[in-house]
């Protein structure tokens, strides 16, 4: 799997028109896109279907969490849409229900561990006694036990997570920032090079590409950095 299959560009824009222009600008350089709530609520599900039909891969970032039956029903419908990845919060019952619902569909289910915008203070405020690292590892183990296809975590935890989940699960890391980039609202960040070296399989990059003066140049620079991290292993 090369850099192009590993880079996921976050379409974190408010309208379908802006998303269409960005996809057109990035052209064949980018294969994989993330679509989340912002775009979904602007009509993004139909846009996601169209992108998938055109040959792009779609990571639908819905972070589902509900009672088992509701999660299963939602996953069954999403599995029919041609999406490549879907997120849900890494709670054991929800994950098990989702895995059963997605069986045989080819949809890769990802368990969200701890948001990269959260640190220990944020977790404490939310009532958690564990630090981010410990909670990520616990939820990664639960995701593996549930039969999930991968997890979402900070690249800071990727190496430790790999030891828990084994060699086959995807490790998808947001909070990717090239050297010199503004962190924005992210708190646990890493460069593309370091994230891949730490064991991430896929990198989610939004603002450093979307908000760049030339998004295509920004994407190509990140892809080049990723290639250098993968060489000579070419994983």
From Swiss-Prot:
Reactions accelerated catalytically: orotidine 5'-phosphate + H(+) = UMP + CO2
Pfam families, alphabetized: OMPdecase
Residues that coordinate or bind substrate: 12, 34, 61-70, 116, 177, 186, 206-207
Domain of life the protein comes from: Bacteria
Biological process per Gene Ontology, one example term: 'de novo' pyrimidine nucleobase biosynthetic process
Covalent S-S links between cysteines: none
Principal EC category: lyase
Transmembrane segment boundaries: none
This protein's pathway: Pyrimidine metabolism; UMP biosynthesis via de novo pathway; UMP from orotate: step 2/2
GO cellular component, as recorded: cytosol
The protein's Enzyme Commission number: 4.1.1.23
InterPro entries linked: Aldolase_TIM, OMPdecase, OMPdecase_AS, OMPdecase_bac, OMPdeCOase_dom, RibuloseP-bd_barrel
Keyword annotations of the record: Decarboxylase, Lyase, Pyrimidine biosynthesis
Recorded GO MF terms: orotidine-5'-phosphate decarboxylase activity
Location of the active site: 63
Annotated family: Belongs to the OMP decarboxylase family. Type 1 subfamily.
Role description: Catalyzes the decarboxylation of orotidine 5'-monophosphate (OMP) to uridine 5'-monophosphate (UMP).
Subunit-structure text: Homodimer.
Cross-referenced NCBIfam families: PRK00230.1, pyrF
Name of the featured protein: Orotidine 5'-phosphate decarboxylase
UniProt source species: Rhizobium johnstonii (strain DSM 114642 / LMG 32736 / 3841)
Gene that encodes the chain: pyrF
């Amino acid at each position: 799997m090369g850099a192009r299959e590993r880079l996921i560009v976050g379409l974190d824009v408010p309208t379908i028109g802006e998303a269409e222009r960005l996809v057109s600008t990035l052209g064949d350089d980018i294969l994989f896109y993330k679509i989340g709530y912002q775009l979904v609520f602007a009509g993004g599900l139909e846009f996601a279907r169209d992108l998938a039909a055109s040959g792009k891969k779609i990571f639908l970032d819905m972070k589902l969490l509900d009672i088992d039956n509701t999660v299963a029903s939602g996953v069954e419908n999403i599995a029919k849409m041609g999406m490549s990845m879907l997120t849900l919060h890494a709670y054991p019952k929800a994950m098990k229900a989702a895995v059963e619902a997605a069986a045989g569909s080819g949809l890769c289910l990802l368990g969200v561990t701890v948001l990269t915008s959260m640190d220990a203070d944020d977790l404490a405020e939310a009532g958690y006694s564990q630090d981010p690292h410990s909670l990520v590892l616990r939820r990664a183990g639960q995701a593996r036990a549930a039969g999930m296809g991968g997890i979402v975590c900070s690249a800071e935890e990727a190496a430790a997570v790999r030891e828990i989940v084994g060699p086959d699960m995807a490790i998808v890391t947001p909070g990717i920032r090239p050297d010199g980039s503004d962190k924005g609202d992210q708190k646990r960040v890493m460069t593309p090079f370091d994230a891949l070296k730490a064991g991430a399989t896929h990198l989610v990059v939004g603002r450093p590409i979307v908000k760049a003066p030339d998004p295509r140049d920004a994407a190509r620079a990140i892809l080049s950095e990723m290639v250098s991290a993968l060489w000579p292993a070419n994983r």
